[in-house]
C-alpha cells in the first residue's frame, strides 16, 4: 500500500525548516510522497493577516520543484469557507483509495489536540506524525503522546528532529525591517516575495 505524507500549513512564507521537516518525514517513515497542503481559510488564524492564498500556493510550488517526491494540493484553497483537518484527510482518503496517510504536524498541535474538530476522524483517516519544535520539552511531549494513544487507541509517531529556529513570523519580520532572508528560503521564494512586495512596510 502506498504511504503518503500530508504536510499542511499557511506557509506564509514556506522556508527551509518546512522542507527539512518534510524530507525527514519522507526518509524516516519511508513514504512514497509528501503532499504539501497550503491552507485556505484556516479556522485558528486571523484571515486578514495572511498573504493571499494564490501567492502562498505559488511560493510552495516553487520551493518543492527540486524534489520529485514532494507535490502540492490545492484542495483547501479551492474549498471555500473554513478548512478543517478532518475534512482534508477525508477528501484525500476518498481520492486516493488504497493509501496510508500520515498527517505531519508540530508539537504545538499535539498539546492542543483535544481542541481539534472531529479528532476521531483524523485518527480514522490518517496516522498522526508529530515533530518537535523549539520551546517544547521532549519528555512532556512523549507523555502527552502516550495519553492520546491510550485515549484514542492509536499510535502517534513522534519525530525527534533538529530544532531549526526559523519561523515564517521571523522571516516576515526581517523582510519588514529590510533585513536579508534569502538564506532562510528555498530557491526562488525570495523572488516571489519581491515580485509581490510581501511583508514590507506600507
UniProtKB/Swiss-Prot annotation:
SUPFAM superfamilies recorded: Nucleotidylyl transferase
Pathway assignment: Cofactor biosynthesis; NAD(+) biosynthesis; deamido-NAD(+) from nicotinate D-ribonucleotide: step 1/1
Catalyzed reaction equations: nicotinate beta-D-ribonucleotide + ATP + H(+) = deamido-NAD(+) + diphosphate
Keywords of this entry: ATP-binding, NAD, Nucleotide-binding, Nucleotidyltransferase, Pyridine nucleotide biosynthesis, Transferase
Pfam family, one: CTP_transf_like
Family: Belongs to the NadD family.
Entry protein name: Probable nicotinate-nucleotide adenylyltransferase
Organism: Clostridium perfringens (strain ATCC 13124 / DSM 756 / JCM 1290 / NCIMB 6125 / NCTC 8237 / Type A)
Amino acid at each position: 500500500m502506498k504511504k503518503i505524507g500530508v504536510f499542511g500549513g499557511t506557509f506564509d512564507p514556506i522556508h527551509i525548516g518546512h522542507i527539512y521537516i518534510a524530507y525527514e518525514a519522507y526518509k524516516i517513515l519511508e513514504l512514497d510522497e509528501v503532499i504539501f497542503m497550503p491552507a485556505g481559510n484556516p479556522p485558528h488564524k486571523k484571515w486578514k493577516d495572511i498573504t493571499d492564498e494564490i501567492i502562498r500556493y505559488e511560493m510552495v510550488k516553487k520551493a518543492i520543484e527540486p524534489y520529485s517526491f514532494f507535490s502540492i494540493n490545492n484542495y483547501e484553497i479551492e474549498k471555500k469557507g473554513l478548512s478543517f483537518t478532518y475534512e482534508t484527510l477525508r477528501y484525500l482518503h476518498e481520492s486516493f483509495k488504497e493509501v496510508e496517510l500520515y498527517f505531519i504536524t508540530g508539537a504545538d498541535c499535539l498539546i492542543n489536540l483535544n481542541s481539534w474538530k472531529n479528532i476521531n476522524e483524523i485518527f480514522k483517516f490518517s496516522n498522526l506524525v508529530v515533530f518537535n519544535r523549539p520551546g517544547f520539552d521532549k519528555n512532556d511531549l512523549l507523555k502527552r503522546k502516550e495519553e492520546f494513544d491510550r485515549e484514542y487507541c492509536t499510535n502517534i509517531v513522534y519525530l525527534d528532529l533538529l530544532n531549526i529556529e526559523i519561523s515564517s513570523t521571523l522571516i516576515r519580520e526581517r523582510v519588514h525591517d529590510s533585513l536579508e532572508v534569502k538564506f532562510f528560503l528555498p530557491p526562488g521564494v525570495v523572488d516571489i516575495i519581491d515580485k509581490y512586495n510581501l511583508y514590507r512596510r506600507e
